[in-house]
Regions:
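Conserved RNase H-like, two-metal-ion catalytic cores of nucleic-acid enzymes
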Residues: 21-127, 134
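Metal-dependent phosphoesterase core characteristic of DEDDh/y 3'-5' exonuclease domains
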Residues: 27, 82-120, 133-241, 245-249, ...
């Protein structure tokens, strides 16, 4: 896959010169992933029994069917039952970047090579993850929303399952610091200082965005719950657009956090 556009993500050529030294800019990558459940027939009979054991215990067939549907929806959340279908990445300062997305059929000629964000179709998940891990070492730090609890462990485990080399293994280190990983879901709750019901209880990204006057990534009528449906319908670009809106909102939220709350101990 062509990765020339990846180089535009890296800002190390934007340095300031002093009287006696050169200070390189700190490179910060903001990213988000979208996941889609693997088909049920991907799992053997024993695995399916394990996955739906909770539903199969229910005596009422209607309740059992409903519970099975709920469990199928939850499969998107786990790297052993789902795959990464999109990763959107932006440089926190320049807001240039890439959106890597799985697409069976996509016309790259539609893309504007001069655009600040390049949409890069990938044939499969392995190609997508390989492209991501080629970009990752170019950055000193990352910013996510709930990345410590979801995005990072998910891509670590999917990469391991597909034997894709992981180039940054320090994103799940010491929790109570913002480098190299600033997780805004942790920062805006002060590391869950007040639990689920206190003043710093956690809200979702949509709620935080609206509270701070940022356009919600869900404003266009698409959410993460739609990814399975969009994949089945071949609407790959719609997934990529939504994932990018998530990252753009995260960048805006990060800027507000850094200016107004950064440094609170």
């Amino acid at each position: 896959m062509e990765l020339a556009a990846c180089q535009e993500l890296h800002p190390r050529d934007n340095f300031q010169t002093g009287s006696s030294s050169i200070q390189l800019a700190m490179a910060t990558l903001v990213f988000d992933i979208e996941t889609s459940a693997l088909p049920i027939d991907h799992f053997d009979e024993v695995q399916q029994e394990y996955l739906f054991r909770d539903a199969n215990k229910l005596p009422d067939p209607v309740a059992r069917h409903a519970r099975k549907g709920e469990l199928e929806m939850q499969m998107n959340l786990y790297p052993f039952t789902a795959r990464v279908v999109c990763i959107a990445m932006l440089n926190a300062d320049s807001q240039r970047g890439q959106v890597l997305f799985i697409a069976d059929d996509y016309d790259e000629k539609e893309e504007n090579e001069a655009a600040p964000v390049q949409f890069v179709p990938c044939m499969d998940e392995g190609e997508l993850l390989s492209a991501f891990w080629e970009v990752a070492p170019k950055y000193d730090s990352i910013v996510t929303f709930n990345g410590r609890g979801f995005d990072v462990p998910f891509i670590y485990l999917r990469s391991a399952l597909l034997n894709v080399p992981i180039t940054r293994k320090d994103w799940l280190g010491y929790r109570y610091q913002t480098a190299p990983h600033c997780d805004l879901a942790e920062q805006l709750t002060f590391y869950c200082v007040s639990g689920r019901d206190g003043a710093a209880r956690r809200f979702n990204l949509d709620f935080y965005c609206k509270a701070f006057g940022i356009e919600s990534p869900k404003a266009h009528g698409v959410s993460g719950m739609d990814v399975n449906r969009l994949m089945a319908a071949g609407q790959f670009r719609e997934i990529a657009d939504y994932c990018l809106r998530d990252v753009q909102a995260t960048v805006s939220l990060y800027q507000i956090w850094k200016e107004r709350l950064g440094g609170i101990k």
